[in-house]
């Protein structure tokens, strides 16, 4: 029986899938792949605002019933997948549904995984060359890889429907909510996890108020449910290795000093908030 639902969100290309797979080794914790639950909420929210029979209900009755319907539905969804007591639902979309998630359970916690934007951009760039069959564009339907590099670096961060641009756009709202509820949020930098994975996980367990679990970094389990990346038709890759490897920053070898500076200047608030040492 699911006793507690938590959320994993943040930015793409941050090793969130890997961290979820590591946590999934714990017999008390079930972690999802990319979770579709936010889309159920979106559909219910939309229909309950359109259909007369919903709107005819007393506002408070509708609110209570609506929240309880979603709360019980999410519980039932995950209990069909696992008998573990703690569930981590991974989706960047959760950042757009905080009034909902706090209404479901104010005790839920939010693991927010971030990374230097320059390395996220480098990761996307390498995926576009690794999978040339993927048709990736910035909304204008022109081949994205043919656009000038300065344009690409800007569009990754500013296109609000893109894999990085959308969660980056909602991040200030996320931080506002996190400041109001500091014990509910844990900001995990990819760089910290990369340098000190065991310490990072110990800190996560402490924050979750769970006993520490000694993970085997040489035998990282696969996700319980395989995720078919081709479906997304985008620069997405969720396969992880079975051994934890330390990564070196990519951007110093890939970007010029001018390009690196442009990413920082275009996203100054991000670097001031999370990576002031890069300024």
Where do the model's predicted regions map?
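Hydrophobic/aromatic beta-strand patches that form the interior of the parallel beta-sheet core
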Residues: 6, 30, 109-112, 186-188
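PAPS-dependent sulfotransferase catalytic domain
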Residues: 66-77, 122-207
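Conserved phosphate-donor/acceptor-positioning beta-strand/loop module used by diverse small-molecule
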Residues: 90, 101-126
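PAPS-dependent sulfotransferases, especially Golgi type II membrane carbohydrate sulfotransferases
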Residues: 1-6, 157-161, 175-179, 206-279
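PAPS-dependent sulfotransferase catalytic core
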Residues: 1-73, 81, 129, 141-144, ...
């Amino acid at each position: 029986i699911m006793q507690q639902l938590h959320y994993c969100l943040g930015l793409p290309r941050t090793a969130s899938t890997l961290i979820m797979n590591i946590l999934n080794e714990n017999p008390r914790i079930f972690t999802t792949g990319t979770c579709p639950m936010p889309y159920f909420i979106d559909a219910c929210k939309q229909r309950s605002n359109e259909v007369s029979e919903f709107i005819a209900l007393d506002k408070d009755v509708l609110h209570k019933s609506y929240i309880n319907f979603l709360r019980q539905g999410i519980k039932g969804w995950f209990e069909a997948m696992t008998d573990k007591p703690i569930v981590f639902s991974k989706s960047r979309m959760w950042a757009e549904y905080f009034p909902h998630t706090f209404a479901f359970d104010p005790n839920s916690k939010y693991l927010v995984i971030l990374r230097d934007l320059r390395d996220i951009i480098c990761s996307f760039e390498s995926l576009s060359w690794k999978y040339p069959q993927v048709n990736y564009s910035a909304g204008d339907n022109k081949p994205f890889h043919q656009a000038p590099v300065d344009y690409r670096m800007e569009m990754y961060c500013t296109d609000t429907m893109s894999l990085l641009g959308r969660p980056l756009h909602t991040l200030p709202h996320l931080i506002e909510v996190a400041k109001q509820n500091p014990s509910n949020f844990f900001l995990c930098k990819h760089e910290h996890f990369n340098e000190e994975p065991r310490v990072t996980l110990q800190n996560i367990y402490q924050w979750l108020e769970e006993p520490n679990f000694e993970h085997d970094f040489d035998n990282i389990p696969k996700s319980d449910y395989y995720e078919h990346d081709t479906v997304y038709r985008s620069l997405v890759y969720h396969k992880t290795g079975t051994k934890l490897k330390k990564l070196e920053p990519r951007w110093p070898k890939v970007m010029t000093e001018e390009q690196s500076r442009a990413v920082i200047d275009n996203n100054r608030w991000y670097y001031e908030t999370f990576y002031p040492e890069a300024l």
